[in-house]
Structure formats: structure tokens, C-alpha cells
Amino acid sequence: MKIITVLLLTLVSALVYGQNQTKRALFLGNSYTGVNNLPQMIANVATSMGDTLEWEMEAPGGYYLYDHSISTTSISKIESGNWDYVILQDQSQAMTLPNTQMYLVYSSAKLLDSLIKENNPCGETMFYMTWGRENGDSLFYQIYSPWYAEPSYEFMDSLIHERYMQISTNNNAEVSPVGAVWNYIRQNHPGIGLYQADESHPSVAGSYIAACCFYTPLFRKDPRLVSFNSSLSLAEASTIKDAVKLVVYDSLVKWNIGIYDSINSVACASANLNVNSERQNSNLQMFPNPVTDILTLKVYPEKDSVQIQIYDWSGVLIREIEGAGTRRIDIRELANGVYFIRLKNRSNTALKFVKN
């Protein structure tokens, strides 16, 4: 399955590579997002590649995901809809709390992700993986040791990495692995200064890493071709772009980038279907709708055998069967609710039905 996903991502990248794209992104974070105006820096990177990023940002200093989950401003921006991506970034220390104290982080992320998917069925959630502080977190070491093993960059960064990967998997979301590239640069190019004097916030070079790390998954293009270097020297910018190519672009699946595209495409298609009026198309007819027990499908052309997929309202694949011509599907064991029928590998073939 992973090999198939990699091949599909390679094909998609090839198809979009020469195309100019426009994306709309909402950034919800704090000063790690706001410093150096990261969204505008990403937009500048995109412009240098012939692409366009339209963006909005809500990033008050010190904000947690919990703060965004109860903020009328953040919620209103999510509900305005039509975002291709909503990027979520938590306060850096929140991702290094003991396991017993992570509930609020996970529940806030789940709530925000649910709001995003409800109001942006054609969009995706992406988490902004940040980095460990330059010399670790001595305060959390004092408070939480011995669980907090050591006040080092390495320990803090490993926790942040682990938690962002877990939270993205929990929510079928993508990750922009800024912290992973940050780690690579620290190990292999220590001469590039990534931090401000506070040993926490990003320098211009640190924000440039983030900009390239976001451009790459948002547009699925090779960052080495980016011509915008901000105020960095050509050598520094090239080193960073090479690192992003190695860590991110060459390993998109590792960061969940693209692996939920099929789920999102079903949710997007379903948002544009009306259960009362869109009961058939040139590839598929379906009746009755609503349905109680047996759903009848007619697949065209009748001689073609296809994979018929049934998804629940959240985009989770719950059944896949092979069929051609007329098929009668027993759905009595399904819970009452909204479902979607999709013909695999047939673009724009998705219908909504109600089980009652």
C-alpha cells in the first residue's frame, strides 16, 4: 500500500510540477508563526516559483491550540471556509508535557480539526512541527523530572517530533516537519544560526527553513528550484533548500503528505452532492435513497468491472467490493447516517446516500 501511495504521489508531483497553482491557507499559531511574518515568506517563496499563496493568520503571542479552540476570531476564520489548508501550531512547551497532561492538547487539536473538516470539506489540516529550544528547557526539567529526562535540545526536540506525528495521525492530517529539518541543519551545518537571542524564536534562517518546509507540501514541488532567498546568502539558502529536499520532498509519505488525499477527495465530492437530486451520473445509478436495507447500484458501462467503495461521513473507507452491471448491496448492518459511494479510479464519481 505504501509503495502504491509513493507512486501516486510521484505521479501527482509530475502532473503539477509545471503548473502554476494558487492555494489558500489559514495559519493558526503564535509567535513562532508570526515572527518574520512566516506566511508572507511562504508566499514570497511561492511567487518565485510562479505559484500564489493567499493567506490569513491568527497568531497571538503565547497562544496554545486550546486558546484557538475557544477563540471566536480563530473559529470565525475557520468557518469562513474555502481554505485549501488550515495550519495548526501549538505552544512549543505544550508538546513536551508528561503523557498524563497531554489530554488538553489532543482534545483541542481534535476539536479544531473537526471544525476545519466541517467547514472546509475540500481542505486539509496540517500541523506545524516546531523545534526544541537551543539549549533545552531547564524549567520543565525542574518541574517534571525525573520524567523529563534532561534539559537538552535533543530531548525536547524528540518529544515535539513524537507528539506532532501522533497528533497528525490521530486526525488524518499532514505535517510540515520544520523541526526535523531544523534538526538536520543543526547536526550537519551548525554554522547556520537558527535562533534569536532568546534561544527559542527563529532567526531569518529559521523562518526560511519553515517557509520552504511549508511550500514543499502545500504545492508538492522541489524546493531546490526556489529562487527567493530572503536576506540569506546564496550559500545558506541553497543549503537549507537542499535539506528540505532531502528531509521533506524525498519523503512526503513519512510526513503523511498526500496519504489522505483519497479520503479528502470523497469528502470534497460529497459536499457538492445533494442527496435528493444527485442520484445518478454517467457512471453510476443508485436507488432507493434514502435506503433501509438493500441498496441497488447500476454501474456503466455494464461490462466494466470496478471497485465500489463505501465511505462513512468522515471519509473512512468501510467497505470495498468488486462489481459490474447491477449490484444489490445489503447495508442493514450499517448505522443510520450519511454515506458515500465512490467508484475507484473513476474521477468525479461519488454519490451520497442516507441509511435510515
Can you describe what each PLM-predicted range is?
Residues 77-200, 216:
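Alpha-helical cap/lid subdomain in secreted, periplasmic
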Residues 30-31, 203:
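Ser/Thr-glycine-rich phosphate-binding loops at phosphate-binding pockets of nucleotides
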Residues 194, 201, 205, 211-272:
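Conserved catalytic region of serine esterases and O-acyltransferases that act on ester linkages
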